[in-house]
């Protein structure tokens, strides 16, 4: 049986996240959705995954988080293949809010209960997570009565209450109004500053410019660029990347 090593490793102490993607591929129904992706990420900062429609952005994110098994290749955390134990050190927020039929604070304490935390710790973590998300005044409100933006912030607060090493987000602001989007962006900046690695899919070039430290750019399932955000937006190397930034590709 393969021994799962802790995420805090020599690679992490040297500024490298223990995430390596090697020759990753996913084929579904004879169609190659992800095609030979290789990359390694730093353990800090915010990485944006971008690309046109059908590029494989969300699928790559799900592969990284271990929600979908690859057809080929390997995903390593601290040199160890993805496992349930490793995935418990991560959290993910999807485009549409997924919430329990509970109050706002109940959504968080229930998630922490599932992780086996004590009552006092659940309560303190939930209160702090709601405060960070600006939802402390809605703690006892049923999640269903919150606005779309508030529900998404609650999903993010619940994820952050788990104190993950890595936070994955799949277009978390795609259907939100500007004010809700700004609130979530501020929360993500705060999350990054606190040392959590953030990996996010977005089709919004403006949002990527505001948030990204580095950019993964996909085109038809292939990695065409992986570089710092400043370089990607000033000197994109691929034709698809240049067209995307210029707004010439459908996103």
State where each predicted segment sits:
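A short, surface-exposed alpha-helical micro-motif characterized by mixed small hydrophobic
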Residues: 208-210
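Helix-to-loop junction immediately C-terminal to a conserved catalytic motif
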Residues: 65
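H-loop/switch region of ABC-family ATPase nucleotide-binding domains
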Residues: 202-203
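Helix N-cap at the start of a conserved alpha-helix in ABC-type nucleotide-binding domains
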Residues: 178-180
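Conserved ABC ATPase signature
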Residues: 142-146, 150
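Conserved ABC ATPase "signature" region
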Residues: 120-138
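Catalytic Walker B motif of ABC-type/P-loop ATPase nucleotide-binding domains
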Residues: 167-170
């Amino acid at each position: 049986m393969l021994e799962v090593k802790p995420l805090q490793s020599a690679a992490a102490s040297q500024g490298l996240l223990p995430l390596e993607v090697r020759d990753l591929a996913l084929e579904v129904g004879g169609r190659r959705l992800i095609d030979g992706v290789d990359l390694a990420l730093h353990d800090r900062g915010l990485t944006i995954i971008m690309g046109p429609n059908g590029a494989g952005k969300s699928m790559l994110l799900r592969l990284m988080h271990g929600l979908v098994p690859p057809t080929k290749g390997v995903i390593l955390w601290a040199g160890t293949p993805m496992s349930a134990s490793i995935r418990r050190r991560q959290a993910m927020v999807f485009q549409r809010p997924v919430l329990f039929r509970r109050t706002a604070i109940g959504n968080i304490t229930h998630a922490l209960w599932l992780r086996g935390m004590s009552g006092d710790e659940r309560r303190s973590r939930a209160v702090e997570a709601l405060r960070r998300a600006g939802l402390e005044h809605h703690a006892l409100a049923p999640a269903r009565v919150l606005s779309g933006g508030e529900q998404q912030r609650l999903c993010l607060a619940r994820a952050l209450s788990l104190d993950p090493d890595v936070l994955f987000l799949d277009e978390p602001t795609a259907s939100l109004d500007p004010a809700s989007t700004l609130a979530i962006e501020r929360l993500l900046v705060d999350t990054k500053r606190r040392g959590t690695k953030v990996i996010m899919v977005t089709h919004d070039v403006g949002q990527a410019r505001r948030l990204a430290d580095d950019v993964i750019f996909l085109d038809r399932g292939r990695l065409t660029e992986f570089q710092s955000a400043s370089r990607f937006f000033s000197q994109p190397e691929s034709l698809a990347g240049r067209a995307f930034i210029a707004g010439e590709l459908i996103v």
